[in-house]
Amino acid sequence: MAQREKKVEEPTELRAPEMTLCANSCGFPGNPATNNLCQNCFLAASASSSSSSAAASPSTTSLPVFPVVEKPRQAVQSSAAAAVALVVERPTAGPVESSSKASRSSSVNRCHSCRRRVGLTGFRCRCGELYCGAHRYSDRHDCSFDYKSAARDAIARENPVVRAAKIVRF
């Protein structure tokens, strides 16, 4: 008990440094080591000062100029025109009914082997079909996926054959 009274507790309070915003008023926190500029503004200012022969003082730095990258619009327009052409070519009477039946049957998840409804607990096999918990393993259903060749290809892809140059002996 006497030992506890002699021990003086020191405060273990951690203080975070005050956050200062960027000097260019971009909204990001500034760093005192970079004259209160954020990383983006500092990189832009250093790039502009290195490209120009006259170095600007930190108080007279201007806002950084970011290049504007324009996306190619021709690809978007051509794909939109192709989609319109595809829509125009479809007949509207017959396939609409069959597509509604197909979407209705695909929304019901059933086991491929026993046709039991599996819902969200279904397991998708590597052969591409959906199975229940009883048929989820490849030996429980007639799986058409070749696991041996897939593993062989994966091993060959991950471990390429390295051949050294032939040593010429004199």
UniProtKB/Swiss-Prot annotation:
Q: Show the SMART domains listed in the entry.
A: ZnF_A20, ZnF_AN1
Q: Which GO terms describe its molecular function?
A: DNA binding; ubiquitin-protein transferase activity; zinc ion binding
Factors inducing expression = By cold, dehydration and salt stress.
Q: Name one GO biological process term.
A: protein ubiquitination
> Has keyword DNA repair?
no
Residue sites binding Zn(2+) 3 per the record: C125, C127, H141, C143
* Ligand binding (Zn(2+) 2): C111, C114, C132, H135
Tell me any Pfam family this protein matches: zf-AN1
Function, as annotated: May be involved in environmental stress response.
Which protein are we looking at?
A: Zinc finger A20 and AN1 domain-containing stress-associated protein 11
Organism of origin is Oryza sativa subsp. japonica (Rice)
List the top taxonomic levels of the source: Eukaryota, Viridiplantae, Streptophyta, Embryophyta, Tracheophyta
Q: Which gene encodes it?
A: SAP11
